[in-house]
């Protein structure tokens, strides 16, 4: 069967080839109904726009791709990423000017560790790697470009994944969805055991610290625009497990969700702020990710609230930064490097052939107790 081209899509959709190209590369310039029609027809015909269509024609590229949400792309203007610094080439730097110093608590270390595992496994197998990243404000063109150049693609999407033509890609190359629990596509789904992690946290808080009043903080709606908005389906899964396990233990779950105000930076953690102002904080805050926990602890400390003496805070992920902050963060450690390795192995096992049905793999997690809960 001949490879489907942009001309085939344009003819069936009744539009110009330029409109088809714009639908993938500049979707904001195409009417919603036209864009939806083009994407639907592309999916039906198995068309994948590519920056390297020759790779698809060859059938094999010897390269695997990984596409990740990078929260650094969400940082505001003037954060040191976009602007030239006048002292960048100076022999002497003013020690008081440190706004270009990297903030270890603000880096997507979860993504970094997964990427490292993916890279190591590809290196071990003699495969090349093509990486891509986007913020939530970006469209899907970079994903489809990468997909056309690789034999398989791992994705670490967050709240914007519904914008991606994933159903179309899943019919063309093998996909591994990292941190996604909703098995809608014929692809591999790779997650840590979120439910087990939450149970371990709750058990520790109840049995060791005698806590019976706790609440969850996390972007359960997906797609938060805050600086820590790296949350994915994992956070939704963790919240669901949290609420369910509170009920199983006979604890009040009516106030299980304290804060999901992650839609914009102006609204970020507004419910936590309100709880501080009204003096109605629970005994413990269980955060959906370590990065959310960092921001919560900063907010509490800046408000004169001691952690863990006044309020216990826990995270989830186990990134390195949790050991560098004060107090050290009690968290659930998930095997991030192993997630990357497994993603690469799963893609390698397919030899470029897409999955015919969903396949799921869940990796175990463990509790790490430190100072933010009063241990260690």
Language-model segments: residues:
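Bacterial carbohydrate/catabolite-sensing allosteric modules
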Residues: 44, 94-100, 113-128, 152, ...
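N-terminal helix-turn-helix DNA-binding module of bacterial transcription factors
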Residues: 1-63
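Central regulatory/effector-binding core of bacterial HTH transcription factors
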Residues: 106-108, 115-156
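Active-site-adjacent beta->alpha loops and helix N-cap segments on the catalytic face
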Residues: 162-170
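Short acidic active-site motifs
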Residues: 138-142, 163-164, 267, 271
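Redox-cofactor binding/interface segments in oxidoreductases and associated redox assembly factors
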Residues: 66, 155, 287
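N-terminal helix-turn-helix/winged-helix DNA-binding helices
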Residues: 2-4, 43-106
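Short beta->alpha connector loops
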Residues: 47, 134-139, 156-162, 291
């Amino acid at each position: 069967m001949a490879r489907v081209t942009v001309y085939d899509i344009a003819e069936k959709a009744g539009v110009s080839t330029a409109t088809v190209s714009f639908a993938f590369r500049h979707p904001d310039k195409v009417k919603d109904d036209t864009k939806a029609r083009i994407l639907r027809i592309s999916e039906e015909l198995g068309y994948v726009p590519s920056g390297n269509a020759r790779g698809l024609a060859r059938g094999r590229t010897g390269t695997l791709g990984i596409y990740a949400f990078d929260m650094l792309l969400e940082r505001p203007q003037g954060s040191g990423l976009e602007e030239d610094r006048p002292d960048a080439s100076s022999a002497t730097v003013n020690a008081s000017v440190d706004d270009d110093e990297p903030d270890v608590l603000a880096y997507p270390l979860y993504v970094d560790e997964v990427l490292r595992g993916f890279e190591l496994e590809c290196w071990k197998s003699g495969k090349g790697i093509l990486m891509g990243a986007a913020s939530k404000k970006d469209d899907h063109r970079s994903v489809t470009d990468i997909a056309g150049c690789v034999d398989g693609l791992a994705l670490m999407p967050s709240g914007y994944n519904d914008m991606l033509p994933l159903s179309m890609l899943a019919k063309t190359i093998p996909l591994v969805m990292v941190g996604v629990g909703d098995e809608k596509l014929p692809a591999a789904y790779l997650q840590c055991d979120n439910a087990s992690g939450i149970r371990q946290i709750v058990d520790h808080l109840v049995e060791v610290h005698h806590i019976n009043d706790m609440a969850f903080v996390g972007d359960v709606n997906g797609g938060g625009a805050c600086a820590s908005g790296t949350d994915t389906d994992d956070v939704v899964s963790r919240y669901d497990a949290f609420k369910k396990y509170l009920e199983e233990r006979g604890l009040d779950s009516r106030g299980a969700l304290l804060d999901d105000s992650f839609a914009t930076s102006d609204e970020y953690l507004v419910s936590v702020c309100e709880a501080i102002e009204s003096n109605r904080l629970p005994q413990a805050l269980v955060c959906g990710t370590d990065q959310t926990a960092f921001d919560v602890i900063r907010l509490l400390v800046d408000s004169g609230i001691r952690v863990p003496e006044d309020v216990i805070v826990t995270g989830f992920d186990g990134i390195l930064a949790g050991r560098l902050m004060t107090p050290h963060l009690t968290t659930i450690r998930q095997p991030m490097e192993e997630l990357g390795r497994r993603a690469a192995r799963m893609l390698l096992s397919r030899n470029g052939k897409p999955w015919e049905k969903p396949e799921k793999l869940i990796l175990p997690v463990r509790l790490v107790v430190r100072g933010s809960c009063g241990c260690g």
